[in-house]
Amino acid sequence: GKTRHSGLEAQTRYALGELSPALDNLSVYASYAYVNAEIREKGDTYGNQVPFSPKHKGTFGVDYKPGSWTFNFNGDFQSSQFADNANTVAESADGSTGRIPGYMLWGARVAYDFGPQMANLNLALGVKNIFDHAYYTRSYDDNNKGLYAGQPRTLYLQGSMKF
């Protein structure tokens, strides 16, 4: 059916070393998106929020980059959303209707860049959802119904090379 999406996005990054030499290699960043996604199909659900479309999403964090190392701490959030066109608040037993609560997740990552002498090999170790917050996310199947448990605390190893 017909929908209308309007909103705004903003992002910023600031190198704190510009404030004081003691803060060299330290930067902060943030991004934010507001989306007003409404159903525009005539009928009982006209004007309701489009399912699985949170109004607010964002991220923020801090990077510290001394030499070849990078240390990062970040947070990601999103507001609540609905699982159906009717914007039903109460959750059904199968999760196909109801409000999906918003959530906030924290992550951290440490990386080392070996530089051009090793083909710019970069190795990183990180953790997503540090506090193992239980949350729900939307389904990604073809019928677009239901909830899935969000990713639990996850430790990861990452590598990249330029060649």
Segments (PLM) and residue ranges:
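Surface-exposed coil/turn segments at beta-strand junctions on protein surfaces, enriched
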Residues: P21, S53, Y64, R99-P101, ...
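Outer-membrane beta-barrel pore domains
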Residues: L16, G98, A108-Y112, M161
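Residues that define the transmembrane beta-barrel architecture of outer-membrane proteins
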Residues: R4-L8, P54-G58, G102-W106, A119, ...
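Gram-negative outer-membrane beta-barrel transporters
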Residues: G1-A86, S160
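Glycine-rich, flexible loop segments associated with nucleotide phosphate handling
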Residues: L23-S31, G95-P101, A119-G126
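Extracellular loop and loop/strand-boundary signature of outer-membrane beta-barrel proteins
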Residues: K42-Q49, S92-G98, D142-L147
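C-terminal beta-signal and adjacent terminal beta-strands/loops
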Residues: S79-N87, Y112-F163
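Extracytoplasmic gating/loop element in the C-terminal half of outer-membrane beta-barrel translocons
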Residues: N74-D76, A83-V89, A93-I100, G107
